[in-house]
Amino acid sequence: MEMELDDQGRMVVRPLLTDLYQATMGLGYWRAGRACEEAEFELFFRHCPFGGSFALTAGLQDCIRFLRAFRLRDADVQFLASVLPPDTDPAFFEHLRALDCSRVSVRALPEGSLAFPGVPLLQVSGPLLLVQLLETPLLCLVSYASLVATNAARLRLIAGPDKRLLEMGLRRAQGPDGGFTASIYSYLGGFDSSSNTLAGQLRGVPVAGTLAHSFITSFLGSEVPPDPMLAPASSEGPAVDLPASVNLWLKHVCIYLGLEEREPHLGERAAFVAYALAFPRAFQGLLDSYSVRRSGLPNFLAVALALGELGYRAVGVRLDSGDLLQQAKEIRGIFRTVGAEFQMPWLEFVPIAVSNNIDEKELARLAQKGSEVNVIGIGTNVVTCPKQPSMGCVYKLVSVGGQPRIKLTEESQKETLPGSKAAFRFLVSEGSLLLDLLQLAEEPPPKAGQELRVWLQGAQEPCTVKPAQVEPLLRLYLQQGQPYEPLPSLEESRAFAQQSLSRLRPAHKQLQNPAVYQVALSEKLRALVDSLSARGAL
């Protein structure tokens, strides 16, 4: 992994996780005597991912950790010396050795914010050479984190508020860094938990999981537990031989379900018993190792009823193949009738979890009204973001020495907005979002109830808006290398993301053909763009 530990034992990326041309440009700045000129870059995206109308910002905490720990080691400088021209002035490498972020300031959207095209996720200011070197690692830290958080938010919108979503994609992710990042930011985006224990240990993500088919198929049925006895949940009364009790319950279950007692797989039942002895208060069954109807379900019921007799309650079952929606419906019906038949009514409410390469289409089916599915495990389709594998974030220069800079290209979409800017969110009276406004930092902030002439991006004429509420978007998190505003916890950012999404209009939440959320420019910013464009950015 391209990580090292900071002074608090947390993982941070290393400075050389960057592109070579950052170092070659750095040498160019230094040779031109411009290394220490004050500059500002903005990190943003041009199009919302997945064909949607919004994105969620993520990765800010990782960026601040990276900046606070930034320092090139001797080995880093020696490597750069080996790939730069051999006649490079040694004083340049001494300059690199002395670099830190003590003159860097960062304004940013709070983590978990709604973000829209062109609005800066980060504004990074400091010495030109240094803030140029920061481009690639900051993009790396923000782009994928925001993409995964947005993907998770979309999946949460499809699932609705009541289904529990489990991220289980570590084994399918693009490497350990990708898996770790996905586990953190799918949680921020709205998932309930992750199977990734490292994300739980290092970042506090709630961890959850079931069991795999390998555990079940490893048992033949001839295994004898070293201690088959299980005490009641209340600790009152004698311990019971659990395997023997399960076998007795299996007779009743098979008669009730119309099965022969030899049909349920002996090894599967032994596996369930072993798991129940290890986790009597958290017993769950994976039902499809052999046959759900003829084996997994009756074996699970026998163990669950034996545990229930001792005062324990099974916590769930999982399905991993077949028609998940239909099977869940059938299983819920059996749980209901078996619970009533054997006076264990809690059985009706045992959660049913499903997994099996679930994508947006299948998730919508599993989340439909009347579905008996409670927990949905998603792996590949959350961590790999198959509908769009990259967020497309960019990091562009907007000012040097206090003078605005613009990039003019052959594609109007790729032109940049010059100058140091402020961003505001306009809301209507009921609290839903109206539009975002970008203006020059030197302009007075807009006020609620004030009529403003603004330019919607791409418009040929200005329009007038009158916001009921105005919220500033960018906050100062790092000032001259020192923390300014405390970073929220992951839990706080997750809650903020859900609150932010709740204020988005339904037309903007649509996952297919959504309404476009508008981002506008102030008249002064639009005039600056026109002026610099006409002059060719001279």
Swiss-Prot record:
Named cofactor requirement(s): Mg(2+); Mn(2+)
Membership in a protein family: Belongs to the NAPRTase family.
CC annotations in GO: cytosol
PTM-bearing positions, type Phosphohistidine: 213
Keyword flag Phosphoprotein: yes
One term of GO molecular function: metal ion binding
Main location: cytoplasm
Record's protein name: Nicotinate phosphoribosyltransferase
Top-level taxon of the source organism: Eukaryota
Enzyme class: ligase
Organism from which the protein derives: Rattus norvegicus (Rat)
Classification via InterPro entries: Aldolase_TIM, NAPRTase_C, NAPRTase_N, Nic_PRibTrfase-Fam, Nic_PRibTrfase_pncB, Nicotinate_pribotase-like_C
Residues the record lists as binding 5-phospho-alpha-D-ribose 1-diphosphate: 380
Alphabetical list of Pfam families matching this protein: NAPRTase_C, NAPRTase_N
Assembly description: Homodimer.
Post-translational modification, as annotated: Transiently phosphorylated on a His residue during the reaction cycle. Phosphorylation strongly increases the affinity for substrates and increases the rate of nicotinate D-ribonucleotide production. Dephosphorylation regenerates the low-affinity form of the enzyme, leading to product release.
UniProt EC number: 6.3.4.21
GO biological process, one term: response to oxidative stress
Binding site for nicotinate: 21, 210, 318
Swiss-Prot/TrEMBL keywords: Cytoplasm, Ligase, Magnesium, Manganese, Metal-binding, Phosphoprotein, Pyridine nucleotide biosynthesis, Transferase
Pathway linked to the protein: Cofactor biosynthesis; NAD(+) biosynthesis; nicotinate D-ribonucleotide from nicotinate: step 1/1
Cofactor note: Activity is highest with Mn(2+).
Location(s), subcellular: Cytoplasm, Cytosol
Reaction it catalyzes: nicotinate + 5-phospho-alpha-D-ribose 1-diphosphate + ATP + H2O = nicotinate beta-D-ribonucleotide + ADP + phosphate + diphosphate
Function per UniProt: Catalyzes the first step in the biosynthesis of NAD from nicotinic acid, the ATP-dependent synthesis of beta-nicotinate D-ribonucleotide from nicotinate and 5-phospho-D-ribose 1-phosphate. Helps prevent cellular oxidative stress via its role in NAD biosynthesis.
